[in-house]
């Protein structure tokens, strides 16, 4: 038996038959025995043969299958029982060839059958303890805890499912309530706005300034003045040219002049109608006076007077008695003539009106 070492310092066993004596022997070879057998070795510098014997590790620290996967250890199966008994007794149990050998051969290697059985049982028990400890360490809980955990999870899942089924109904109820509340608020706001707008039509809002009285008489006077000012604004819009006037006195004078000019135009038109049909005698003064009285009784503005309304009321047969060969003048023509007369100032001269005869013709000059 001889020992050999490679460059990395790895050691192995080698056997051979001596040609001279026919004795089988076991030697150390450079084949790495732990490269494939034991994946738990952290580095390649550690020698399992030397360190295992020096540290005094027992067979219970190593799995029996470590040597079973190593093809280099299967060569011990054909050894004779008496040839290597001394070497096998001193060799650690982790390097024994359990893979290809039976129970009787292992006993022959170790010197007795009882010793081999004890080693095998010790290895199996240590392997089972190791796996049990590792499982407990990974789980970190007792079997009772493992059983209670699924029950708690199942209860929590049931509660979650029930809440999820109830949530859509609650959400729908809440959305309907919000919609109803919004509608009720909108209706209340509309009613309040309508109730606020209705009283504004019935009264005039007056703000009391500093130095002004707030009793009922003074407030009534202020309301009356406010109404007068509104009517003045209406007249100002009807009369042309009054928008540029600021003073009330000047504006009233302009309105009076405009009304007088309208009266003169009405007189002129009535005379013109008399010339068309001489048989009709029209008392213009009486008609105008009656129309003015009616307008005052109805509290209608004077500017809204229709000059032809009195003619139709007092002379209902005017259209029947007129000569059919003369067509009635259209309203647009009458308006254009009135404007021309107003611009020319023809009506403003009273001597011109006196030159007309009662029947509408000019008087001969003497």
UniProtKB/Swiss-Prot annotation:
Gene Ontology MF term list: DNA-binding transcription factor activity; protein dimerization activity; transcription cis-regulatory region binding
Q: Does the keyword Transferase apply?
A: no
- Annotated region (Disordered) at 1-20, 123-201
**Cysteine disulfide links:** none
Q: Which InterPro entries match?
A: bHLH_dom, bHLH_ZIP_TF, HLH_DNA-bd_sf
Q: One short Pfam family name for this protein?
A: HLH
The superkingdom of the source organism is: Eukaryota
Comp. bias (Basic and acidic residues): 123-134, 159-170
Enumerate the spans annotated as bHLH domain.
Answer: 212-262
Cellular component terms per the entry's GO annotation: nucleus
Which subcellular locations apply to this protein? Nucleus
Where does the record place Gly residues bias? 1-11
What SUPFAM superfamilies is this protein classified in? HLH, helix-loop-helix DNA-binding domain
**Keywords attached to this entry:** DNA-binding, Growth regulation, Nucleus, Transcription, Transcription regulation
Q: Where does tissue-level expression of this protein occur?
A: Expressed constitutively in roots, leaves, stems, and flowers.
Which Gene Ontology BP annotations are present?
A: regulation of DNA-templated transcription; response to blue light
Q: What does this protein do?
A: Transcriptional activator involved in cell elongation. Regulates the expression of a subset of genes involved in cell expansion by binding to the G-box motif. Binds to chromatin DNA of the FT gene and promotes its expression, and thus triggers flowering in response to blue light.
Q: What else is known?
A: Plants over-expressing BHLH74 show increased hypocotyl and cotyledon lengths.
Q: How does it assemble?
A: Homodimer. Interacts with IBH1. Binds reversibly to CRY2 after blue light illumination.
Give the protein name, as stated in the record.
Transcription factor bHLH74
Source organism per UniProt: Arabidopsis thaliana (Mouse-ear cress)
